[in-house]
Amino acid sequence: MPPTPRPDPGPPAPGVDPFQEARRDDCPWCGSRRLRTMVRAPEGPRRTPGTFVVDECRDCCHAFQNPRPTADGLLLRHHRHPTEGHIRSNLAGRLRRRHHRTAARAMLPYIEPESWLDVGTGHGYFPEAAREVHPYTAFDGVDPTPRVERARAAGRIEEAYQGLLTDPEITARLRARYDVVSMFHHLEHTADPRAELRAARTILRPDGHLLVEVPDPARPFGTLTMVPRWPGRAHDRPRPLHLMPLRNLLAELRSLGYEVVATRSCAPFPPRAHRIIARRTALPPAPVAPPPDPSAP
């Protein structure tokens, strides 16, 4: 599928950073204004232009980049991911492949999928590994970069969609099409995790399953996923846009019409992560307003 067309916003206004939005003074998850700064880094060599600050909500413990990158900043970040050869050759890549097979096996007790969409698939390494566990499943992939087309050309996925899962054109085309949707360390890199979960529900078939892995901010090294760690990259921009406490994410899944069937801690190496399996159910009934009080003036 060709990339989803986007309108040209034109040149930015004077004094406007094309790679960063305006700083916000409330939590993107619960709306609280009780924020504290966890990380503040100066400018320097980095993955995307601009400085960065990581704030945490004192009420719901949601951590997020503030200000966050614009759509152009996110696209620049996606294009600077490691190369295919580098991912293949290092130890982390080999551990990740083994971890992918384990994650694919996690679905065996719940469903025999005919169709599976991997969101943020990149080079398509998860579908390639998962096919060893589910040989009769058709794996497709969606990713904002041309890597997804190369994954299709390499035979790791059957259909490739270049763009975002939340793009209306992609969501409409894939509506109720998949038995499983997977998101491996994808939600924390998106501008709006809630929108991603809603889009995933749209493209799942009734009783389809969502498989999610996200960093665990409550474990050792959890918050360090927001902070540079590699020697010689003292000011690299941190990758995740959000760190979501497990209780927040589970509550959101249930409110969107998912039944959480399994959660566990997992990761091939630090930082630790949560794996969540949720089944698509009917949306919960809308809250009914209480009847008017006849005694009220």
Which residues does each PLM region occupy?
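A short glycine-rich, Lys/Arg-flanked "PGG" loop and its adjoining helix->strand segment in the class I
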Residues: 194-209
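Short, glycine-/aromatic-enriched active-site segment of Class I SAM-dependent methyltransferases
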Residues: 7, 213-242, 247-252
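Hydrophobic/aromatic residues located in beta-strands of well-ordered beta-sheets
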Residues: 139, 210-212
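Hydrophobic residues in well-ordered beta-strands that form the structural core
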Residues: 66, 212-213
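Conserved N-terminal segment of class I S-adenosyl-L-methionine
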Residues: 2-184, 193-197, 264-266, 272-277, ...
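Phosphate-binding active sites in nucleotide-utilizing proteins
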Residues: 189
